[in-house]
Design a protein with these regions (language model features):
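Single conserved hydrophobic/aromatic residue that forms the stacking wall/gate
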Residues: 1-13
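Short beta-to-alpha transition helix within the HATPase_c
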Residues: 19-23, 35-53
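Conserved short strand/loop->alpha-helix "switch" segment adjacent to the catalytic nucleotide/phosphoryl-transfer site
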Residues: 31, 57-78, 133
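Conserved ATP-binding N-box helix of the HATPase_c
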Residues: 72-95
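Short beta-strand/loop element within the Bergerat-fold HATPase_c
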Residues: 97-109
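Glycine-rich/acidic phosphate-handling loop/turn and adjacent ATP-lid/helix
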Residues: 111-139
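Glycine-rich nucleotide-binding loop
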Residues: 122, 161-168
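ATP phosphate-binding glycine-rich loop and adjacent ATP-lid/helix-beta elements
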Residues: 128-156
Protein backbone atom coordinates (compact mmCIF):
# COMPACT_ATOMS: atom_id res chain seq x y z
CA UNK A 1 0.00 0.00 0.00
CA UNK A 2 2.84 2.40 0.91
CA UNK A 3 4.55 1.69 -2.43
CA UNK A 4 1.29 2.30 -4.28
CA UNK A 5 0.85 5.72 -2.64
CA UNK A 6 4.43 6.65 -3.52
CA UNK A 7 3.84 5.62 -7.16
CA UNK A 8 0.65 7.69 -7.28
CA UNK A 9 2.50 10.74 -5.95
CA UNK A 10 5.29 10.26 -8.47
CA UNK A 11 2.74 9.93 -11.28
CA UNK A 12 1.03 13.14 -10.13
CA UNK A 13 4.37 14.96 -10.17
CA UNK A 14 5.22 13.58 -13.61
CA UNK A 15 1.75 14.40 -14.93
CA UNK A 16 2.06 17.96 -13.64
CA UNK A 17 5.47 18.36 -15.25
CA UNK A 18 4.26 16.94 -18.56
CA UNK A 19 1.16 19.13 -18.50
CA UNK A 20 3.29 22.20 -17.86
CA UNK A 21 5.76 21.28 -20.60
CA UNK A 22 2.91 20.54 -23.01
CA UNK A 23 1.29 23.91 -22.23
CA UNK A 24 4.62 25.71 -22.82
CA UNK A 25 5.08 23.95 -26.15
CA UNK A 26 1.49 24.59 -27.21
CA UNK A 27 1.77 28.28 -26.32
CA UNK A 28 4.93 28.64 -28.39
CA UNK A 29 4.34 26.07 -31.14
CA UNK A 30 2.61 28.49 -33.46
CA UNK A 31 4.79 31.42 -32.50
CA UNK A 32 7.69 30.17 -34.63
CA UNK A 33 6.72 28.73 -37.99
CA UNK A 34 9.49 29.45 -40.47
CA UNK A 35 9.13 26.09 -42.18
CA UNK A 36 12.52 25.01 -40.83
CA UNK A 37 12.22 22.62 -37.90
CA UNK A 38 15.69 23.43 -36.55
CA UNK A 39 15.02 27.18 -36.41
CA UNK A 40 11.52 26.73 -35.01
CA UNK A 41 12.71 24.26 -32.35
CA UNK A 42 15.66 26.35 -31.19
CA UNK A 43 13.65 29.55 -31.03
CA UNK A 44 10.81 27.84 -29.16
CA UNK A 45 13.22 26.25 -26.69
CA UNK A 46 15.22 29.42 -26.00
CA UNK A 47 12.06 31.53 -25.80
CA UNK A 48 10.77 29.21 -23.04
CA UNK A 49 14.16 29.22 -21.26
CA UNK A 50 14.30 33.01 -21.43
CA UNK A 51 10.76 33.33 -20.08
CA UNK A 52 11.68 31.01 -17.21
CA UNK A 53 14.51 33.41 -16.28
CA UNK A 54 12.48 36.62 -16.77
CA UNK A 55 14.40 37.51 -19.92
CA UNK A 56 12.53 39.14 -22.79
CA UNK A 57 12.90 37.12 -26.01
CA UNK A 58 11.87 38.79 -29.26
CA UNK A 59 12.38 37.86 -32.86
CA UNK A 60 11.93 39.20 -36.34
CA UNK A 61 11.89 36.39 -38.87
CA UNK A 62 11.65 36.51 -42.64
CA UNK A 63 13.13 33.20 -43.70
CA UNK A 64 12.51 31.16 -46.81
CA UNK A 65 13.38 27.70 -45.52
CA UNK A 66 14.45 26.40 -48.95
CA UNK A 67 17.07 29.15 -49.18
CA UNK A 68 18.91 28.43 -45.93
CA UNK A 69 22.46 27.53 -47.04
CA UNK A 70 23.30 25.57 -43.88
CA UNK A 71 22.34 21.95 -43.35
CA UNK A 72 20.46 21.03 -40.17
CA UNK A 73 23.63 19.99 -38.35
CA UNK A 74 25.41 23.26 -39.16
CA UNK A 75 22.33 25.30 -38.33
CA UNK A 76 22.06 23.50 -34.97
CA UNK A 77 25.65 24.34 -34.11
CA UNK A 78 25.26 27.99 -35.14
CA UNK A 79 21.93 28.64 -33.42
CA UNK A 80 22.73 26.49 -30.40
CA UNK A 81 25.99 28.27 -29.65
CA UNK A 82 24.77 31.79 -30.35
CA UNK A 83 21.52 31.43 -28.40
CA UNK A 84 23.24 29.61 -25.54
CA UNK A 85 25.83 32.38 -25.24
CA UNK A 86 23.08 35.02 -25.30
CA UNK A 87 21.02 33.27 -22.65
CA UNK A 88 24.07 32.74 -20.43
CA UNK A 89 25.07 36.41 -20.71
CA UNK A 90 21.56 37.49 -19.70
CA UNK A 91 21.36 35.00 -16.83
CA UNK A 92 24.56 36.31 -15.26
CA UNK A 93 23.38 39.91 -15.54
CA UNK A 94 21.84 41.70 -12.55
CA UNK A 95 20.20 44.57 -14.45
CA UNK A 96 16.39 44.65 -14.28
CA UNK A 97 15.99 44.80 -18.07
CA UNK A 98 17.35 41.72 -19.80
CA UNK A 99 16.61 40.71 -23.37
CA UNK A 100 17.56 38.62 -26.36
CA UNK A 101 16.57 39.92 -29.80
CA UNK A 102 16.91 37.61 -32.80
CA UNK A 103 16.63 38.89 -36.37
CA UNK A 104 16.86 36.20 -39.03
CA UNK A 105 16.25 36.68 -42.74
CA UNK A 106 16.95 35.22 -46.15
CA UNK A 107 17.46 38.45 -48.07
CA UNK A 108 16.56 39.33 -51.63
CA UNK A 109 20.30 39.82 -52.19
CA UNK A 110 20.67 36.06 -51.63
CA UNK A 111 22.13 36.09 -48.13
CA UNK A 112 21.11 34.24 -45.00
CA UNK A 113 21.49 36.70 -42.13
CA UNK A 114 21.35 36.17 -38.38
CA UNK A 115 21.69 39.08 -35.94
CA UNK A 116 21.40 38.40 -32.23
CA UNK A 117 21.54 41.19 -29.65
CA UNK A 118 21.49 40.55 -25.93
CA UNK A 119 22.04 42.44 -22.74
CA UNK A 120 25.03 41.55 -20.59
CA UNK A 121 27.03 42.74 -17.65
CA UNK A 122 29.58 45.36 -18.73
CA UNK A 123 33.17 44.27 -18.26
CA UNK A 124 35.61 46.85 -16.95
CA UNK A 125 38.42 47.36 -19.44
CA UNK A 126 41.16 46.78 -16.87
CA UNK A 127 39.79 43.29 -16.11
CA UNK A 128 39.69 42.10 -19.71
CA UNK A 129 42.61 40.10 -20.98
CA UNK A 130 43.22 40.15 -24.72
CA UNK A 131 41.57 37.09 -26.26
CA UNK A 132 40.15 36.27 -29.65
CA UNK A 133 36.57 36.40 -28.36
CA UNK A 134 36.32 39.37 -26.00
CA UNK A 135 34.39 38.96 -22.78
CA UNK A 136 33.18 35.44 -23.55
CA UNK A 137 34.14 32.12 -22.05
CA UNK A 138 32.55 30.35 -25.01
CA UNK A 139 35.53 30.45 -27.37
CA UNK A 140 35.13 26.89 -28.67
CA UNK A 141 31.47 27.38 -29.53
CA UNK A 142 32.15 30.61 -31.35
CA UNK A 143 35.10 29.02 -33.10
CA UNK A 144 32.79 26.26 -34.38
CA UNK A 145 30.33 28.91 -35.57
CA UNK A 146 33.15 30.83 -37.27
CA UNK A 147 34.41 27.65 -38.97
CA UNK A 148 30.95 26.88 -40.39
CA UNK A 149 30.44 30.47 -41.57
CA UNK A 150 33.92 30.54 -43.14
CA UNK A 151 33.30 27.19 -44.89
CA UNK A 152 30.17 28.70 -46.44
CA UNK A 153 32.08 31.83 -47.58
CA UNK A 154 30.22 33.99 -45.08
CA UNK A 155 31.19 36.58 -42.50
CA UNK A 156 30.68 36.84 -38.76
CA UNK A 157 31.24 39.89 -36.60
CA UNK A 158 30.49 40.73 -32.99
CA UNK A 159 30.33 43.99 -31.12
CA UNK A 160 30.63 44.54 -27.38
CA UNK A 161 28.81 47.76 -26.55
CA UNK A 162 29.24 47.58 -22.79
CA UNK A 163 25.83 46.45 -21.63
CA UNK A 164 24.86 44.77 -24.92
CA UNK A 165 26.50 42.21 -27.17
CA UNK A 166 25.68 41.89 -30.87
CA UNK A 167 26.53 38.99 -33.18
CA UNK A 168 26.03 39.46 -36.91
CA UNK A 169 26.54 36.71 -39.42
CA UNK A 170 25.85 36.57 -43.12
CA UNK A 171 26.16 33.55 -45.39
CA UNK A 172 25.64 33.80 -49.15
CA UNK A 173 22.93 31.63 -50.65
CA UNK A 174 24.79 29.87 -53.46
CA UNK A 175 23.16 26.89 -55.12
CA UNK A 176 24.99 24.42 -57.31
CA UNK A 177 23.37 23.19 -60.49
CA UNK A 178 21.86 20.14 -58.76
CA UNK A 179 20.08 22.38 -56.23
CA UNK A 180 22.36 21.67 -53.28
CA UNK A 181 24.26 24.38 -51.44
CA UNK A 182 28.01 24.78 -51.47
Amino acid sequence: LHLSIRRQRQMCIETGFLSSAKADLKANSTKYNTGNLVIDSFLTNYDILAQNHNISFESILNVTSNDIPLNNYELSIVLGNLLDNSLHACQTQTAPIRYIHVHMVTSSQKHFIINITNTKTPVLSHTVSPVNYPNLSHGYGLENVRRIVDDKHGTIHWEDEGDTFIVKLMVPIIKKKNGHYM
